[in-house]
Amino acid sequence: MVSITKLFGSYGSNCKLDSFNDEMKFFAKMSILDWCGVAYAAKKEPVSKIVSEMVKEENGINQARVISTGDKVSSRGAALANGATGHALDYDDTHFLFVGHPTSSALPAALALGEELGSSMEDILLAYMAGVEVSTRIGHILGYSHYNAGFHQTATSGSFGSTIVASKLLNLNEDQTINALGLVSTRASGIKSQFGTMGKPFHAGMAASNGIEAAKLSKLGFVSREDGIECEQGFFLTHGWDKKIP
């Protein structure tokens, strides 16, 4: 089998903004606008308040802003809280190849880490688009067999997308990006039994936070498997994949 981890790690490390045509950029901006609207509308939802309060209590560093409260917390904390807020009303964008909501994890990671790093809007847009591309393709490979086994692609595939987002913004090289994907393969989680509870929107925040964590650890030298997605007992083979690559 082709190394999926290396394939997407290489793509994420090397893609440029001009890799995407104008139509793709237009729809990316519409998805960003959509997410901002639904996140703002949900900032007083109970799940938004609870998660935002938790990250505020844990806060020891002011890196990125929480939508629900306006407080500045760590970028991981902001990604967690804002991801949950953006998915709280469940009106965020949907991709049916992905079988989930790709923006709800990729964009909170991009905005939080981008704020911490002082990234340009062009860099944030590129990171977001690259992350959505990877999470959607991984979600498409996993397909409905993964979803029908009880997994929530917004959380699982979304974790890989947010890892690409964070890797781009942190300027990780190809090997570091591959390593980050390998690491997040053991973090990506989220089960459909949480649907109908606060656990479902929390999945989006988990995925956003997972990506920042994996990329930052990889940048510091943390070592994981370079085939963590597709290896024996890796992510694909333990998460309902039907062994088909579309």
Predicted region positions:
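N-terminal core-entry segment
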Residues: 1-246
